């Protein structure tokens, strides 16, 4: 019973803070701008990093929701830095896979194939 009361109190407080932030002007526009900037990254990364990207953006979005609801600039800054770090890691992985090949010449055999199967899978000798 005590836990239910605390959860109810927390949710009421979040709703109250969101209402107060609407009148002051909040930073939802900034997060929408970040979301629009992330859309071009979704298309090339759906093969390799799609699930990672969706989880990362979802967790950052939930964090941004609470940061916007509480009006805390420090929390907003932390989630903005987290989003930038995630984007940098995903882009570095994408560029590493694109420009590093086993031959060491900087060119990949097939640029569209970003998801390679594990080494243990031998697809030439598969039996059905």
Swiss-Prot record:
Molecular function terms, GO-annotated: metal ion binding
GO cellular component, one term: plasma membrane
Domain of life according to the entry: Bacteria
Keyword annotations of the record: Cell membrane, Membrane, Mercuric resistance, Mercury, Metal-binding, Plasmid, Transmembrane, Transmembrane helix, Transport
Residue intervals passing through the bilayer: 28-48, 71-91
GO BP terms: response to mercury ion
Subcellular location: Cell membrane
Annotated binding of Hg(2+), by residue: 47-48, 114-115
Region annotation (Disordered) ranges: 101-128
This protein's name: Mercuric transport protein
Biological source species: Staphylococcus aureus
């Amino acid at each position: 019973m005590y836990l239910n009361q605390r959860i109810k109190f927390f949710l009421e407080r979040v709703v109250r803070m969101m209402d107060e932030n609407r009148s002051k002007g909040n930073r939802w526009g900034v997060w929408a701008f970040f979301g629009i900037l992330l859309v071009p990254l979704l298309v090339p990364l759906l093969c390799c990093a799609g699930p990672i990207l969706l989880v990362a953006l979802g967790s950052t979005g939930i964090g941004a929701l609470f940061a916007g609801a509480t009006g805390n600039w420090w929390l907003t800054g932390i989630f903005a830095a987290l989003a930038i770090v995630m984007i940098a890691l995903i882009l570095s992985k994408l560029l590493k896979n694109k420009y590093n090949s086993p031959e060491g010449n900087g060119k990949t055999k097939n640029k569209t194939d970003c998801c390679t199967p594990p080494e243990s899978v031998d697809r030439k000798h598969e039996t059905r």
